[in-house]
UniProtKB/Swiss-Prot annotation:
It holds the Pfam family PGK. Transmembrane segments: none annotated. Pathway: Carbohydrate degradation; glycolysis; pyruvate from D-glyceraldehyde 3-phosphate: step 2/5. Monomer. It comes from Prochlorococcus marinus (strain NATL1A). GO terms for molecular function: ADP binding; ATP binding; phosphoglycerate kinase activity. PROSITE patterns: PGLYCERATE_KINASE (PS00111). It is found in: Cytoplasm. The gene is pgk. This is Phosphoglycerate kinase. It catalyses: (2R)-3-phosphoglycerate + ATP = (2R)-3-phospho-glyceroyl phosphate + ADP.
Length: 401
């Protein structure tokens, strides 16, 4: 699905124009209300700076948290406006509401090259309902629409989908374009062999991804808590490990489907067990067919790491979504860290490595290897849905290229 990008609009199209840019500024805040990680703000800078270079009037729209359609003082975008001002080296004017007379007057007072940040769109109940009247009023502030919020592209909300009915052109920003290029590209035209590493604690949250990837991949590597559902489905004893009893048949069916399609489907051969779920639990290494009663698996073992590394050696594209174990606990982070290091090495050899959002991004950043990967996705749910082959409303609403 090829969409029109901001790069198709020159200064002659944008000079003096009011441009509504949907960004993803849903950043983590500390106890004092300070921003603890500004990655998402920095990710929007190429789009914002390009618009400023083309003398546009930039009106930013973003959500923060889940205020459920009413004003919540702890979810205002004040800290974001301040940080963005520092990054841009110019004052970003913030409105008190995203619509209404005050917002309109601040937008009307803009000159070319000015930036206004509209207050949290989710303070208005019409945002998540994709209310037409709200979308129309939001759109009335601008003339052109740019969506650079890949992290919210799987939502059909007023600011991601509704406004496109009232503005033209509607194009993808540079972050959105990059996300689609890598994630869509990896699925539609990968350099093969293509491997997917799927981790995380639950099969249920990754069913769609696994089903879709079995149709596209040469190899699938499974790690994280979900492996125990596969083991139990094979008739193995898993001790106190996490199992989704209602997904046993599905686990068997996924393995069977992979086999029928000639896809290499790899599960760990050994695991690190713990006697309870805590960072300082007693631990021991065990083969997967010899898991002790009363113990639970919290990481993949060293033999499994080697197995996975060998499987990945010849791959030209690797997508990773979900950790190999409870990487938040130092004792059970080895498997996840080893995979992160392996992918960094593969990247250096020319393999396209894509970290598909969520916890794997946190794991790669914790290991200090983010810069070594080909692409780190900024979307959690959006990345998953794209990998599942779903159409993202925020993307489909944009003009075709």
């Amino acid at each position: 699905m090829s969409k029109r990008s901001l790069s198709s609009l020159g200064a002659e199209d944008l000079c003096g124009k009011r441009v509504l840019v949907r960004v993803d500024f849903n950043v983590p805040l500390g106890d004092e209300g300070q921003i603890t990680d500004d990655t998402r703000i920095r990710a929007a800078l190429p789009t914002i700076n390009d618009l400023l270079d083309k003398s546009a009037r930039v009106i930013l729209s973003a959500h923060f948290g889940r205020p459920k359609g009413e004003v919540n003082e702890t979810m205002r975008l004040t800290a974001v406006a301040q940080r963005l001002s520092e990054l841009l080296g110019k004052t970003v004017v913030k409105t008190e509401s995203c619509i209404g007379a005050e917002a309109k007057s601040k937008v009307d007072a803009m000159s070319n090259g000015d930036v206004v940040l509209l207050e949290n769109v989710r303070f208005i109940s019409g945002e998540e309902k994709n209310d037409t009247e709200f979308a129309k009023e939001l759109a009335s502030l601008a003339e052109v629409y740019v969506n650079d919020a890949f992290g919210a592209a799987h939502r059909a909300h007023a600011s991601t989908e509704g406004v496109t009915k009232f503005l033209s052109p509607c194009v993808a920003g540079y972050l959105m374009e990059k996300e689609l290029k890598y994630l869509q590209g990896a699925i539609d035209q990968p350099k093969s062999p293509l491997a997917a590493i799927v981790g995380g604690s639950k099969v249920s949250s990754k069913i769609g991804v696994l089903e879709s990837l079995i149709d596209k991949c040469d190899k699938i590597i499974v790690g994280g808590g979900m492996i125990f559902t596969f083991y139990k489905a094979r008739g193995l004893s898993v001790g106190n490990s996490l199992v989704e009893e209602d997904k046993l048949e599905l686990a068997s069916a996924l393995e069977k489907k992979a086999k029928e399609k000639g896809v290499e489907f790899l599960l760990p051969t050994d695991v690190v067990l713990a006697d309870n779920f805590s960072p300082d639990a007693n631990s021991k290494l065990s083969k997967v067919d010899a898991i002790s009663e009363g113990w639970m698996g919290l990481d993949i073992g060293s033999e499994s790491v080697e197995l996975f590394q060998n499987a990945l050696k010849d791959c030209k594209t690797v997508i990773w979504n979900g950790p190999m174990g409870v990487f938040e606990f130092e004792k059970f982070a080895n498997g996840t860290n080893a995979i992160a290091n392996t992918l960094a090495e593969l990247s250096a050899q020319g393999c396209c490595t894509i970290i598909g959002g969520g916890d794997s991004v946190a794991a790669v950043e914790k290991a200090g290897l983010a810069k070594n990967m080909s692409h780190i996705s900024t979307g959690g749910g959006a990345s998953l849905e794209l990998l599942e082959g779903k159409v993202l409303p925020g993307v489909s609403a944009l003009d075709d290229a």
